[in-house]
Amino acid sequence: MMRMSWMVTVINRRMMKILIALALIAYIASVWGTYANMRSIQEHGEMKIEQRIDEAVGPLREKIRELELSFTQKYPPVKFLSEKDRKRILITGGAGFVGSHLTDKLMMDGHEVTVVDNFFTGRKRNVEHWIGHENFELINHDVVEPLYIEVDQIYHLASPASPPNYMYNPIKTLKTNTIGTLNMLGLAKRVGARLLLASTSEVYGDPEVHPQNEDYWGHVNPIGPRACYDEGKRVAETMCYAYMKQEGVEVRVARIFNTFGSRMHMNDGRVVSNFILQALQGEALTVYGSGSQTRAFQYVSDLVNGLVSLMNSNISSPVNLGNPEEHTILEFAQLIKSLVASRSHIQFLPEAQDDPQRRRPDIRKAKLLLGWEPVVPLEEGLNKTIQYFSRELEHQANNQYIPKPKAARMKKGRPRHN
């Protein structure tokens, strides 16, 4: 009976979409009718009038396209959930690299997902395969402005995460991580939602404890070139626990270590994307410093599973999500060269300021309390990512993505080994 009720609801929604589409078409017709009358009265200024009409009609065309997709597009398979089990979920930064993969998982699990993104680093095409689906909504919105929506869970991922992007606009990065987090906590308080903050291993800075566990307070330069991101996330964590203690908001905090996979920006300045792109294009692989710095890399699907497990757990203290398998940057460069079968040479450049020398997560807490640990082998994840980057380069060469994503500019500093 419940399934029949759900099917009737879906049919009613589709009927509403048809009515909305017809109303939009009628509106466009009236606009063009007005335009025709104006042209008959006014002989000059045609281009200006036409421009104004295009500005008015453009968003309507986009809406009609979305409505058409809802009838014609084939979506990935979605699990059926009852009203009791289906959650209304908000993902800030949901059109970005990690956010779009999280969107895929939650949609396929049968939940209702609203993605909020200002498209500074997110891309609509990362989630366009869901546009028009009954359970999906995409909102162009900046989290530094308040948002009013009824949800059960909030995954707060919105923030530039690569050095070129957060160094390009450090004030914006700080605002997103402070004011944006404050707005999401306020929303969680108003509607009684649980909030998961996507924090970062950067809160540990250049660590003096190795591997890093959740009790380590960190070693961060508060005025260095990366401080806008590192300290922004530290403040965001502080605000989460202040709201938990004072307002009773349910919070979860994930400290995310280096992650890679499809939908990464090719020019985002992180070591994985840098090395793969350079190897594919036959350019020198640029290593900053000696290459003895270490990192631990996890594939994006492992991270997404960890985020969902943490959200649905009863763990309110911070949890590291990363791969404890440690590699030097030089070893990593040589591995990518081998996987790509590239003849590129390795070029050593001066070390970047405040570049952490060692980074490796202690994930005993995640293993014990969440039953989570990475399962995708490094080479398997890298091969998938290399294939994705190869397709991206081919598409760009054929002008299949218009406009192409713009590379973020850096005011100061150089890319580091994120």
From Swiss-Prot:
Gene ablation phenotype (knockout): Mutants show cartilage defects due to impaired chondrogenesis and have a reduced jaw size.
Co-factor(s): NAD(+)
Compositional bias ranges of the Basic residues kind: 406-418
Residues binding NAD(+): 96-98, 117-118, 120-122, 142-143, 157, 159, 176, 198, 229, 233, 259, 265, 270
Location(s), subcellular: Golgi apparatus, Golgi stack membrane
Pfam families linked to this entry: GDP_Man_Dehyd (PF16363), UXS1_N (PF11803)
GO molecular function, one term: NAD+ binding
Pathway where this protein functions: Nucleotide-sugar biosynthesis; UDP-alpha-D-xylose biosynthesis; UDP-alpha-D-xylose from UDP-alpha-D-glucuronate: step 1/1
The protein's Enzyme Commission number: 4.1.1.35
Organism superkingdom: Eukaryota
Active-site residues (renumbered): Y229
Principal location: Golgi
Residue ranges annotated as Lumenal topological domain: 39-418
The entry's keywords: Decarboxylase, Developmental protein, Glycoprotein, Golgi apparatus, Lyase, Membrane, NAD, Signal-anchor, Transmembrane, Transmembrane helix
Annotated spans, Disordered: 397-418
This protein's record includes keyword Oxidoreductase: no
Transmembrane segments: 18-38
Family: Belongs to the NAD(P)-dependent epimerase/dehydratase family. UDP-glucuronic acid decarboxylase subfamily.
Function: Catalyzes the NAD-dependent decarboxylation of UDP-glucuronic acid to UDP-xylose. Necessary for the biosynthesis of the core tetrasaccharide in glycosaminoglycan biosynthesis. Essential during embryogenesis for craniofacial development.
The protein, known as: UDP-glucuronic acid decarboxylase 1
Organism expressing this protein natively: Danio rerio
Encoding gene (name): uxs1
